[in-house]
Amino acid sequence: ERSFTLRGIILGGEEPGIIYHALGVNGASTRSWLACPRLEEDLSLVTPDLVVFSIGINDAHDPNFSAERYERNYDALIGKVRKVNPDAAVLLVTNSDSYRKRRYPVRNAEAVRRTMLRLAEKHGCGVWDLYGVMGGQGSIRRWKRQGLARPDLVHFTRDGYTLIGDLMFTAIM
């Protein structure tokens, strides 16, 4: 049996502007990103000027969460980016507030956020503090009441994601 795997297509022209690559996968964690065998190879093909990491909430939801392991994994991910693209700017977006089973605040959310802030300082990365922008622990409930978060108290609605994008764009610009 013959197989074919398409890992991506890059189409472009000579016009200046922004080229956007998204490598998001629902449920991804630092551990799953480190398990990607071609991450460095793929990053070397696109040579980004800016890499935005917005991962952490899935790590925080892990019942076997370890702050030390999370920090080691995230540190290794940043290291992979720096190895392949030492001149790329790196922006860390902190985790959002969320709940487990719609009832229990994710107790590791603050530890994940603190780890990101430490790593940003260590590696000279920018930080956009989504957790703080949302309002901290419990804020996802307010976002849900305003139609910005889904009933699972983890994910956002289209309006919520749009607002997050607008707020992040405003902060960067």
Task: Describe the role of every protein-language-model region.
Residues 96-173:
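Catalytic His-Asp segment of secreted/periplasmic serine-dependent ester chemistry enzymes
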Residues 36, 40, 71-78, 113, ...:
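Extracytoplasmic/secreted envelope proteins and their assembly/folding machinery
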Residues 1-76:
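Conserved SGNH/GDSL esterase-like catalytic core that processes O-acyl groups on lipids
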Residues 10, 24, 94-96, 132:
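A mature extracytoplasmic/lumenal domain signature
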Residues 47-60, 68-84, 91-130:
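Conserved N-terminal glycine/acidic-rich loop preference
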Residues 25, 34-41, 64-67, 90, ...:
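Generic preference for flexible, low-structure residues
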Residues 5-8, 40-48, 83-87, 129-137:
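Short, functional N-terminal and low-complexity linear motifs
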Residues 18, 88-90:
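Residue-level recognition of the N-termini of beta-strands and the immediately preceding loop/turn
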